[in-house]
């Protein structure tokens, strides 16, 4: 099955809230470019998705493609490509590839990983690796992460890679003491919510 959507905004007047004191060409345009979203679940396990956005002059502003496989035993494998064009004073360019996985290893244990490679600068922008244990009553996750912030220029002499160790404890029925890790995985791993719900409810 295939799902597709397209959208475009039209304005009746110039924007009153701007990034700078003086409106630029984007603040006075009467419409945006189109945005297109397409996804297809090829079978019970395999899904692909693509998104693209254009500016009103027809230039492509950004696009991405992702594919993920969800297994029947709680495993997930994900690859994707993301491109964003440089728009002065609006957005910086990037050209990146991502991959992630969730793999059960034994009983209630599973390992998870995510990597984000910067094609422009030929370096690993982010990688994350961790382990998760989940029982009927509680769950714990511990992860190590090495990354640059989205706005960091890794070639700048004063910019250094950041490193962190994160932990999350969840008591079933009470929620998590720290939900930042779950939010991070939701944003990084396509299909995480789907596979995580089936894992916790098994």
Task: Please tell me what each predicted stretch does.
Residues 1-202:
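Long, low-hydrophobicity, solvent-exposed regions enriched in small/turn-prone and acidic residues
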């Amino acid at each position: 099955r295939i799902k597709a959507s397209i959208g475009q905004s039209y304005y009746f007047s110039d924007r009153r809230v701007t990034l700078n004191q003086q409106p630029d060409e984007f603040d006075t345009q009467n419409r945006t470019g189109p945005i297109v979203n397409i996804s297809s679940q090829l079978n019970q396990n395999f899904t692909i998705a693509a998104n693209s956005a254009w500016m009103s002059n027809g230039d492509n502003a950004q696009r991405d493609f992702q594919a993920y496989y969800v297994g029947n035993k709680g495993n997930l494998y994900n690859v994707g490509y993301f491109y964003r064009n440089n728009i002065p004073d609006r957005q910086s360019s990037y050209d990146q590839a991502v991959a992630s996985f969730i793999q059960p290893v034994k009983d209630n244990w599973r390992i998870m990983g995510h990597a984000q490679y910067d094609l422009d600068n030929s370096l690993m922008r982010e990688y994350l690796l961790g382990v998760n244990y989940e029982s009927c009553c509680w769950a714990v996750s511990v992860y190590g992460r090495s990354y640059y912030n989205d706005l960091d220029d890794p070639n700048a002499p004063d910019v250094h890679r950041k490193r962190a160790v994160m932990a999350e404890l969840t008591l079933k029925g009470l929620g998590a003491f720290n939900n930042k890790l779950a939010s991070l995985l939701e944003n990084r791993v396509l299909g995480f919510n789907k596979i995580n719900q089936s894992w916790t409810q098994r």
